[in-house]
């Protein structure tokens, strides 16, 4: 099993707890298309419960033989971003990427340079913000027979100071995984567990404790049930009594509908509930 990136050591549990729940926005739409000359387009739009709308247009060109990918994004805030990726050119498993952003309204500019190096039992990354600081964030994970251990650290060059550090351990198996992370300078601890019970049922949970704020432990549990090959339902609830449900179905080839809702079970008589929908079109 491939060694994940540091931020993905608890990915299975985090995806089960957070992905495909549609209540966070009143409505979202995503349109994807591909051209014969290796150019992919994606248009996204979102309307929040506060009636704020936003959107983005993305174009991506991929040259697989040379390991080159160029992505250009333009959003409704009139922010422009260009991302250039080069994979496996200098060394097998090494990917370099440059991210350049520009906001015409304020003339703000951004430039970032990132490195990803992946081998069978190692996954390391380095993120450099060239115009702010500059700053560097580096993380790495080593793995052996499913066992994982990793750490991350941030450094501000101008201040000559470490800006933060984290650590994590985990275990990944084909049908289950577990991870313990310590973030925010080893002050916020999380333990997560994921289990693929069978081809239809998945279950997971996550407990979080912030040593700076007290003894209260936050808990979330979630499950996913695949009804048939084209649809599934998900549900979750946390220790505060906030529950969420979601339904996802492939209406036809290239068209997916998602519907979700959240409820505060402690305040069922109040207008704290949220409902959202999502449409995805892909060609």
From Swiss-Prot:
GO molecular function, one term: porin activity
A Pfam family hit: Porin_3
Keywords: Ion transport, Membrane, Mitochondrion, Mitochondrion outer membrane, Porin, Transmembrane, Transmembrane beta strand, Transport
Cellular localization per UniProt: Mitochondrion outer membrane
Record flagged with keyword Transmembrane: yes
InterPro entries to which the protein is assigned, alphabetical: Porin_dom_sf (IPR023614), Porin_Euk (IPR001925), Porin_Euk/Tom40 (IPR027246)
Chief subcellular location: mitochondrion
GO CC aspect terms: mitochondrial outer membrane; pore complex
Record note on domains: Consists mainly of membrane-spanning sided beta-sheets.
Family: Belongs to the eukaryotic mitochondrial porin family.
Function: Forms a channel through the cell membrane that allows diffusion of small hydrophilic molecules. The channel adopts an open conformation at low or zero membrane potential and a closed conformation at potentials above 30-40 mV. The open state has a weak anion selectivity whereas the closed state is cation-selective.
Protein name: Mitochondrial outer membrane protein porin
